[in-house]
């Protein structure tokens, strides 16, 4: 009998459906249902002058005729009609929502008459709730709010497949075949406890055994349901803590409304379920009263187009006026750039480029259904100690949606999406990674060069197509990842070596071409600059505690964050005809200049100027226009975008760091490399070792250029054919 005790005590008359209600309780229920019915039938919007419309009556009729058996009720409308009704619904939503749905069914019956033949039976109506009240946080939900209506924002990180749940069941006794039908099952994740005994008394036959009942599937009434996993918003997570999760239960028309990665605000009933079977051992009996919480969803609002946690929706008219005044200032571009990481000295062009990344260009949907990304991707390469990681940390805090991750601790699944087993249903479910959770914002990836090549390849699609396609464990789907990527990396040798050219960087051109701007950050030795920098750092340390207000000409962090969210939501500038003409002419000049350079040097350039670079300049121009809330991009914006592109990607390309995979583009160069490699392999067999200095000296005597010898050695090391030993003095051949 120990198992019986663990499951709680149930009475044999529990199959009678709901608990019997006294006359007073029944009368009160009827009275409340009547008031709900009056609300749905009589609530109207409009004035005497413009005329009234019956909001919910008309909506019920329209939805019912379209075959959509649901209606969305605003809690503010209910409160303005009858304050007590709204209070009942907030404090005891489980029973009163049922009354509201019954009232909606009766009103739908009235407004849809006469119905066609065969449709005489009125369908059940699902009522969804919506409220403009301030949302709470997952970590603020306490036991006092149990069984109350709550409003919670967050990100959907996992969704199960849609399954069926019985709302009314029929059971039959195995022994005497006695059937009990139409037993109501409570909504949510609560199950139904089968009666232990059959009470049917028949003379002359033995008594029915214990646990005789089984469910008749054909006579059950079922609805669709789906469970979701909600994670709290990143900006609501205290520093150093893990984000909290909450299980959600959706049924009927609320199923399949969201996918992992969606930012949502849900209205639901804070409920509890039994937290699994407790152990039969005595020491675990203390957990008999413990229940795990979940939210039974009664309304979902999805933040569309990932504009940044609906930040624009919470902006007051006074703030909007302030933002419009800010946008028309002639020096807004410099002001925003100055406000980005003000504690970091210099790096003006990088800060301006980060400002463009935060505002982003305009996403375009073409007539054939394809899209062109509007987000700007930025890569910072260079020396340690140049505040790359500090800039990344600031952007994570400043962006409306920001996710920070480090390359060494990030896997392909963690960045894109993973498929795992649901511990309850044992079905496969999908969980979105960093780039899915940052949909509509910025992903900051530090130590980009420390990532494994396989993991780095996983974000190719996310960076250009802005989607993540999954085909594993029987799940084939596409998730949105409409986010900018801000990455920071060190060079291969730790510090940037100008003599090494493209050997400083170990990235494939496939990933480099996806970055709109690539900055090489060098720690240059300049006495005047070092003096100014040291003075700035000392000032930051001395005034770290005292300085609270923002410096003149800067925007404080919260205002900047709201301004970025407002501009992203309200403005999507396009190129003006003059700006497009100017950009076209400059692109043709860049292409012809590259062609002339190839003709003069009789060598094909390894730095291509392609359409992808042209689109990058367009995106930068649009972000400059968005900063000023302009509908069209001007020639001045195009000039500045071309200047930024020149000081970043083109300068990096001219330094030789973005050349092809081999770095040698002519046929003669390739033949020379293969000759050096063949001679090198002949020099020492597999498993032997030789001094690197002597190898280089031998090849130099044969008049081979030193950079070509180093290139071959680096290539062979990358392929795992040789590696260094004895403090990089000796080469050892592996294969």
Swiss-Prot record:
EC numbers, comma separated: 3.6.4.12
Cited PROSITE patterns: MCM_1, MCM_2
Pfam family, one: MCM_N
Binding site for ADP: 372
Domain MCM: 332-538
Major location category of this protein: nucleus
Localization per Swiss-Prot or TrEMBL: Nucleus; Chromosome
A GO BP entry: regulation of DNA-templated DNA replication initiation
Keywords for the protein's UniProt record, in alphabetical order: ATP-binding, Cell cycle, Chromosome, DNA replication, DNA-binding, Helicase, Hydrolase, Nucleotide-binding, Nucleus
A cellular component annotation (GO) from this entry: nucleus
Molecular function in Gene Ontology: 3'-5' DNA helicase activity; ATP binding; ATP hydrolysis activity; DNA replication origin binding; single-stranded DNA binding; single-stranded DNA helicase activity
Short sequence motif Arginine finger: positions: 513-516
Matches recorded under CDD domains: MCM5
Superkingdom of this protein's organism: Eukaryota
Function: Acts as a component of the MCM2-7 complex (MCM complex) which is the replicative helicase essential for 'once per cell cycle' DNA replication initiation and elongation in eukaryotic cells. Core component of CDC45-MCM-GINS (CMG) helicase, the molecular machine that unwinds template DNA during replication, and around which the replisome is built.
Family per record: Belongs to the MCM family.
Assembly with partners or alone: Component of the mcm2-7 complex (RLF-M). The complex forms a toroidal hexameric ring with the proposed subunit order mcm2-mcm6-mcm4-mcm7-mcm3-mcm5. The heterodimer of mmcm3/mcm5 interacts with mcm4, mmcm6, mcm7 and weakly with mcm2. Component of the CMG helicase complex, composed of the mcm2-7 complex, the GINS complex and cdc45.
Name this polypeptide is given: DNA replication licensing factor mcm5-B
Native species: Xenopus laevis
